[in-house]
């Protein structure tokens, strides 16, 4: 279990804000930090990793104190059993894929670990290649593989898939989910993609101006729990067109474009680019902005 009770003042585009977190993260959870840029999401990841220091508070992981402002305890990053994957994969350009993994190996005598991770991440065919010859998706798979070489208890993911196309993004989301389950890791992801949150997470912290405003499952945080229906889909509004007394919405959901009809009252607060929840009741679609 990760016990966080920290405070840090941040300088943002909105001025100074206080990042205040008093939460517990359970072992094996897949938690997403969701919110606007500058809300404190990445800073919280960096604080957990030991790359930034809170002004006050405490971080306890299991029975080990990682940070305690009163006791003057602050474990350096190399003593915290975490893996960190950034949007920028940060691979060593002069090393092959195998070389990047071997460099991260704690026990240099255990080369079998490299082969195991290459197989799990399905990148064995890339082992002799250097990063410059890899696609964006391949580089991120190697970055995740390199992180797994250290056997981390906690996997910190700072928008690692945001620069990828939708097809590769979906594939790597599945791979992250498999890695999370297979290794029993506690994962913390920063993401702006609601569909990604639903695919990966069992818990969400919604953060605004340094404060956690919502804490719950993706459905609890993003969807109106008063809505009942046979199904619920998250999508992005691509277009809104008037047709007689109705409106036709084109919505991108799960990499597919679907069309939904609605009356004016259904879409009064909905505009192009909004994320919406589509649910169905008695064959009638219900649209809810989220």
Which residues fall in each region the model found?
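Conserved ABC ATPase "signature" region
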Residues: 64-68, 109-126, 178
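Conserved ABC ATPase signature
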Residues: 130-134, 138-140
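A short, proline-enriched helix->beta-strand linker immediately N-terminal to the Walker B motif
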Residues: 149-153
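Catalytic Walker B motif of ABC-type/P-loop ATPase nucleotide-binding domains
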Residues: 155-159
């Amino acid at each position: 279990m990760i016990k966080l009770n920290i405070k840090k003042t941040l300088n943002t585009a909105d001025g100074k804000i206080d990042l205040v977190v008093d939460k517990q993260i359970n072992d094996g959870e897949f938690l997403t930090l969701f919110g606007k840029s500058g809300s404190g999401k990445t800073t919280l990841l960096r604080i957990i990793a030991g790359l930034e220091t809170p002004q006050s508070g405490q971080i306890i992981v299991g029975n080990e104190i990682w940070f305690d402002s009163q006791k003057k305890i602050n474990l350096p990053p190399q003593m915290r059993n975490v893996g960190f994957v950034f949007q920028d994969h940060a691979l060593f350009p002069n090393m092959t894929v195998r070389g990047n993994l071997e460099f991260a190996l704690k026990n240099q005598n255990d080369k079998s670990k490299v082969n195991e991770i290459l197989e799990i991440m399905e990148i064995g065919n890339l082992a002799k290649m250097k990063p410059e010859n890899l696609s964006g998706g391949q580089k991120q798979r190697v970055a995740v593989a390199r992180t797994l070489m250290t056997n981390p208890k906690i996997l910190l993911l700072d928008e690692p898939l945001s620069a990828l196309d939708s097809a590769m993004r979906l594939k790597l989301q599945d791979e992250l989910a498999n890695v999370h389950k297979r290794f029993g890791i506690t994962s913390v992801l920063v993401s702006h993609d609601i569909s990604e949150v639903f695919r990966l997470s069992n818990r969400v912290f919604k953060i605004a101006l340094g404060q956690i405003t919502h804490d719950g499952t993706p459905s609890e945080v993003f969807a109106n729990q008063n809505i009942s229906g046979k199904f619920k889909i998250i999508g992005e509004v691509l277009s809104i067109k008037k047709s007689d007394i109705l409106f036709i919405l084109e919505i991108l959901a799960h990499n597919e474009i679907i069309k939904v009809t609605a009356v004016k009252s259904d879409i009064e607060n909905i505009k192009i680019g909004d994320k919406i929840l589509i649910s169905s009741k008695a064959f009638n679609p219900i649209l809810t902005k989220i």
